[in-house]
From Swiss-Prot:
The RING-CH-type zinc finger domain is required for E3 ligase activity. This is E3 ubiquitin-protein ligase MARCHF1. Expressed in antigen presenting cells, APCs, located in lymph nodes and spleen. Also expressed in lung. Expression is high in follicular B-cells, moderate in dendritic cells and low in splenic T-cells. The chain crosses the membrane at residues 155-175, 197-217. It is found in: Golgi apparatus, trans-Golgi network membrane; Lysosome membrane; Cytoplasmic vesicle membrane; Late endosome membrane. Ubiquitinated via ubiquitin-conjugating enzyme E2 D1/UBE2D1 independently of lysines, leading to proteolytic degradation. GO terms for cellular component: cytoplasm; early endosome membrane; endoplasmic reticulum; endoplasmic reticulum membrane; endosome; Golgi apparatus; intracellular membrane-bounded organelle; late endosome membrane. One of its GO terms (biological process) is immune response. Keywords: Cell membrane, Cytoplasmic vesicle, Endosome, Golgi apparatus, Immunity, Lysosome, Membrane, Metal-binding, Transferase, Transmembrane, Transmembrane helix, Ubl conjugation, Ubl conjugation pathway, Zinc, Zinc-finger. E3 ubiquitin-protein ligase that mediates ubiquitination of TFRC, CD86, FAS and MHC class II proteins, such as HLA-DR alpha and beta, and promotes their subsequent endocytosis and sorting to lysosomes via multivesicular bodies. By constitutively ubiquitinating MHC class II proteins in immature dendritic cells, down-regulates their cell surface localization thus sequestering them in the intracellular endosomal system. Also regulates insulin sensitivity by controlling surface expression of the insulin receptor subunit beta/INSR by direct ubiquitination and degradation. One of its GO terms (molecular function) is MHC protein binding. Residues 59-69 have a biased composition (Polar residues). Gene3D superfamilies: Zinc/RING finger domain, C3HC4 (zinc finger) (3.30.40.10). It comes from Homo sapiens (Human).
Length: 289
């Protein structure tokens, strides 16, 4: 027994497996499990960190969307509500009505063209009557109305029919009046007026009344065409609405006041003969010649 114990003390690693105690084997098993957990933990932490980095970093597919959204955002500059262009020195923007927001600005030329084409003198949104100064062009510079072929055809047919109808009515009235005058002379001689005279008189009255009504209706159409032609060949200068002009002046004055309040006064050093440095008050320096 003593020899065997001495051999074990000299070489403890050569102990057979069946002779080791269960406590030693349990400690070794716990150590192996902790080592395996330590080996697996870096992989998990790395995967978690990679997931966090993926969630935090923006994907490449969303970058162009953000850029496209920024490009689609509307500009805050004032634009014309007809042509959607900005104003410049040649064609500035005016505020002719009481509309607010982006609909209050319009070009003078765009508004002039719209008034000529629509033949209206008020805003279609707020129904405010424009303050206009009109002036007709010289007759040499008049332009034709912009009409379709069907409208021109209708006008030509109506004028032709009107001329023919007026000619027929005038000729029939002349003939009836002439014959009626002859019958009146014969009746004065005989002392009796026959029934054809009264029949002709009724026909003349009906024809004359119908001719007057027809001429009145046609003349209304011609007057409307004449007004359209005059409106198309006039120079219009629309003035700013007084209400909107006052609001713009108030806003401008408020902005100027805020800019003045926010301005910082920087003191400027005086560079004069009186502002000499304090060192010059001491004894003068001697310069070697």
């Amino acid at each position: 027994m003593l020899g065997w114990c001495e051999a074990i003390a000299r070489n403890p690693h050569r102990i057979p497996n069946n002779t080791r105690t269960p406590e030693i084997s349990g400690d070794l098993a716990d150590a192996s499990q902790t080592s395996t957990l330590n080996e697996k933990s870096p992989g998990r932490s790395a995967s978690r960190s990679s997931n966090i980095s993926k969630a935090s970093s923006p994907t490449t597919g969303t970058a162009p969307r953000s850029q496209s959204r920024l490009s689609v955002c509307p500009s805050t500059q004032d634009i014309c509500r007809i042509c959607h262009c900005e104003g410049d020195e040649e064609s500035p923007l005016i505020t002719p009505c009481r509309c607010t927001g982006t609909l209050r600005f319009v070009h003078q030329s765009c508004l002039h063209q719209w008034i000529k084409s629509s033949d209206t003198r008020c805003c279609e949104l707020c129904k405010y009557d424009f303050i206009m100064e009109t002036k007709l062009k010289p007759l040499r510079k008049w332009e034709k109305l912009q009409m379709t072929t069907s409208e021109r055809r209708k006008i030509f047919c109506s004028v032709t029919f009107h001329v023919i109808a007026i000619t027929c009515v005038v000729w029939s009235l002349y003939v009836l009046i002439d014959r009626t005058a002859e019958e009146i002379k014969q009746g004065n001689d005989n002392g009796v007026l026959e029934w054809p005279f009264w029949t002709k008189l009724v026909v003349v009255a009906i024809g004359f009344t119908g001719g007057l009504v027809f001429m009145y209706v046609q003349c209304k159409v011609y007057v409307q065409l004449w007004r359209r032609l005059k409106a198309y060949n006039r120079v219009i200068f629309v003035q700013n609405c007084p209400d909107t002009a006052k609001k713009l002046e108030k806003n401008f004055s408020c902005n100027v006041n805020t800019d003045i309040k926010d301005a910082v006064v920087v003191p400027v050093p005086q560079t004069g003969a009186n502002s000499l440095p304090s060192a010059e008050g001491g004894p003068p320096e001697v310069v070697s010649v």
